[in-house]
């Protein structure tokens, strides 16, 4: 079975584009083949800074023949007195068949004319000729450029094209204005180590042929090589390094034939904060830092860079890199010394000159709002005076480092430098730590703030951002979320859950919106509604995806179009989490099955009544004198006994007490419905009917303290 090789040779591709392009082809090419009825044994996508390639093995020589049934006009329109009409003749002509091929068959809508049409499969070469340009031109990425004088865009100019179906060249042309790139079997090796053309004889020879030209086309193989080379090199230096995933991916996409190069810098730069030095190396120069072996991250005056040049010239390469990092570290040293010449608080006036967001004023204004929200959170948490003061101070200083020279030059160090400058300014450990922690988590897999002050300021900052951006009408839609508002809301919920902070989110949002609306003359009601709905969706997603709660149980605690549950969730994030987790637990251990039928059946029938959902005590809404069967009295007595258990569960949030009561009452409820003394709930007498619906409504209400059982699916 044939193999197919496509290689698109280019000028140096950006590392960010290459990774995305490889991922797109891995997903799209198999889909494209399947859509054209082409099978394959494997689809391997390769990429280096100068090429993007795909090697497909086990292709058929052609598509399978396709048989299809085509429906034509109604039989009565196609034939008259047994003779074909113009409608039948036209249908046969259009489908390219003789009249004898027409068949009349019955359908639900009467008799119609059909044909069985067989379409021969097309040769795979013809199909690939059509598909390849689509694969190339459909690639997405940032800052695509025109190449040639046509309108075709690609990440970088395309210089050569290899297209082989086994040993044969597949004739292809990429036309862009006056420039045409034709397919051939000629590729190119490493720009320095093997600049001469390389002839690829057969598609399956691609990987090894390019390896002979000092090009490792497999990105995963390059990654492994880099990790092994860096580990071996750092061991010789008597230290260790961290393999930063983003750095490793970027370096992998910058080299075709990796080789490690060791560089040095002056020990005087070790006096800089470690974070500054590693940021220069990792984020700006793409170096791997070298740490002393031990418990603490203490740097050694070395770095490792991965070169794409001639390994025999490593000393020359090292000198060039040393010159660059020396200048960068000298800048950092100057920034650090200059920044420390003033206290962190003295930078606050400069925040007035930095815009937070167009139409939302300056960073100084944002800081003032953060201070107010932090005070509201402190009040809700009923914190002592010391904690309140720490929260206010940290909120005031949390953005001050943004106008320092170090953070202006290295934005990745925001918060980190704020902490260090706060310590140098004599701020307390609680305040200093909170300045760096309030940014946490910085990403999906990052840690959460560990200190109370860091948690409070982090919540306040994000709540202000959410209210402010929503207030401008810039609400996330679909996959578009330029201000990372989903991540901010997720952080609010996750910080609250992880730290078990007893906050009323609905109240905080309302207070923050009120402040914003007064300052910017906005209508509060639609803004609060939008924020509440947004947070409810975030809670729903986090419960399902991070806490692994079944969707129906999430619906049961959040309610579906039930304001009572949605308000309760926003007023107490800990309670909604705990109820969802507990429901999942009793589903797993089988307890939910013991109460599901009785509670769910009661819930459905109770919907026909009008009992207030807050009512728990049967003595004021049930009339025992209307009982006609012992099962009613038994149900009533069981409900009376259940009241203190439910109230205790509400007060302590120990829902095991409630569920234990529901388990105990289940046989009594079953007897009410189906036992020897069962009753007809919908009795002809309206008073008896209402009395029985109230009994069922009471059981529903007790269960509602935990969840809306009407939303729970029995056999999920």
From Swiss-Prot:
Xref: InterPro entries: DALR_anticod-bd (IPR008909), Gly-tRNA-synth_bsu (IPR015944), Gly-tRNA-synth_heterodimer (IPR006194)
EC numbers, comma separated: 6.1.1.14
UniProt superkingdom: Bacteria
Organism: Nostoc sp. (strain PCC 7120 / SAG 25.82 / UTEX 2576)
Pfam family, one: tRNA_synt_2f
Record's subunit section: Tetramer of two alpha and two beta subunits.
Chief location bin: cytoplasm
Top-level class of the enzyme under EC nomenclature: ligase
Single GO biological process annotation from the record: glycyl-tRNA aminoacylation
Claim: Signal is one of the keywords in the record: no
Entry's family note: Belongs to the class-II aminoacyl-tRNA synthetase family.
SUPFAM superfamilies: HD-domain/PDEase-like
A cellular component annotation (GO) from this entry: cytosol
Protein name, entry field: Glycine--tRNA ligase beta subunit
Any one GO molecular-function label of the UniProt entry: glycine-tRNA ligase activity
Catalysed reaction equations from the record: tRNA(Gly) + glycine + ATP = glycyl-tRNA(Gly) + AMP + diphosphate
Keywords: Aminoacyl-tRNA synthetase, ATP-binding, Cytoplasm, Ligase, Nucleotide-binding, Protein biosynthesis
Subcellular location(s) per record: Cytoplasm
